[in-house]
């Protein structure tokens, strides 16, 4: 009996082992299908902000050095990255603005942007700066400009990800914006009509799984394109000055987003796909704050921009030194009669505003000096710390205007003339504080 029991137990163990082995083998051979994660990083309406002002915490956002750091970080954890810009990279035409424009174009190339749309402000320096720049992925689907080199522009861009999913990027500029700027040399086709032609071509060729529109137009016009059945994603780069923050709109598995002003945030759209189709889609804005380290990837072009800005300032300084006029009387003179107001000013950030420029090594930057000194680029106003040391900081005359004539009337003993004192100063409003 014992012998039979032993054999029976042995068979039982062998059977259990065989069943376990078969089940384990099946588990190993079952393929696991994980959803592919696709990331779209985007900017737009940067308006030449190479580096943030940083005077206050709320303004210390943005800049190409921090942006490049986040882009590098995203690429280190996900190879499925699409990097785009939706236009208005430049601002108003100035000498320093042109240096910024060149830096921005080089930044697109260094950071590896896949495509960028031109906004209406990006034509302020003409086509020469675009033709000379190193970036050659300007996506202009509905724009014809014979002055732009053909190799610099593309009609649409196809991004093929590791899982085989293809996103078609189409760049559409609003006709009303360019016509308002008087860009008569540039021909802009109706965005809707042009889009229809491209979609027909893409459908016939079966080239794309996801349709993404980079738009630079009024919000409502972009919304009309977003509502089309074949459009999956819209990134709009034009911001209305009265509505700088526009929330994303999600409709099913479609999304429409708007950029954040001056490159202070990096937009990030996350997409999960199955069989090359969108399953889930979401958006977030990554704040480019002071916690983010500067990237070495674009440090060299930023340093070059800084050097050229300093040269620009020194050239202006040499020209200005030839004709110095004394029209500003400085805070010391104001204090004699306006002690109460002076005491309030002395406790304010205005009284030591120049320190922040020294801290960030920006005492030569014209765009910073106009807000941190008194009378910069005005007759008799601030020139440099060494030449006009008494005009550093935002003094009384920075807002009220030069006080030399005011002082002359005060020194005279004529009541009739003293009545004119108030006329000499401009009325101060909120606009007086804006650069």
Could you say what each language-model-derived stretch is?
Residues 1-13:
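N-terminal secretory signal peptides that target proteins for export/translocation
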Residues 19-29:
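Bacterial N-terminal signal peptides
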Residues 21, 62-64, 148-151, 304-315:
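Short coil-to-helix leader/linker segments, especially the first N-terminal amphipathic alpha-helix
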Residues 44-52, 278, 283-435:
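Short sequence/structural segments immediately N-terminal
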